[in-house]
Amino acid sequence: WMDTAMVELKKAIKKTDLLIINDEEAEQLTGEKNIVKSAKKILKMGPRYSIIKKGDKGSVLISNSKKYNLPSYPVLKVIDPTGAGDSFAGGLAGCLASEDKINFESIKKGMICGTITASFCIESFGVEGLKKLDKIKLNKRVEIFKSYLMKVS
């Protein structure tokens, strides 16, 4: 779709604060295979922050002065990855909607919520995993993930 709408896409990107895009789209948009270089080129297009999703390898948040890598949540069995990226973006947006300020730290927090939302998505076909999701399950898995992140950092 980028091939047919690149001019319009770049106009829209210029007006965004945060662009969430997958690694293949980032390469197509910037011509860069390296994720960090690609994200830096995206920042020059207008956004203050860029998140590049890396599928089962997690995601990376880049600003002009900072970088944050987040792994994916280690689910026991992936049933269907369809919709995981959209679930990530939706979970992130939902978390950011409850924040007073949108900044690097609040986006990092949102990425964790997005990662956990995506983890529920991939455990079932279609939206079935998300239909079973509630705030208690989400928060429980967020805490498990945070403890995992503390151990690996």
Over which residues does each language-model region extend?
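Conserved phosphate-binding/catalytic region of the ribokinase-like
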Residues: 35-153
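Conserved beta-alpha-beta core of the PfkB/ribokinase-like small-molecule kinase fold
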Residues: 1-40, 58
